[in-house]
Amino acid sequence: NIVDVPCRDDYYRDSSGNGVYDQLGGCGAA
């Protein structure tokens, strides 16, 4: 996964560029 905004609201962009939230509460690591 490509981290977009690390550790901020657990938000990151997936490999398709879709903004998603990490349910694990990590820094974009899914």
From Swiss-Prot:
One of its GO terms (cellular component) is nematocyst. The keyword Iron-sulfur does not apply. Disulfide bonds join C7-C27. GO terms for molecular function: potassium channel regulator activity; toxin activity. It comes from the Eukaryota. The keyword Secreted applies. Belongs to the sea anemone BBH family. Possible voltage-gated potassium channel (Kv) blocker. This is U-actitoxin-Bcg2a. It comes from Bunodosoma cangicum (Sea anemone). The lineage of its organism: Eukaryota, Metazoa, Cnidaria, Anthozoa, Hexacorallia.
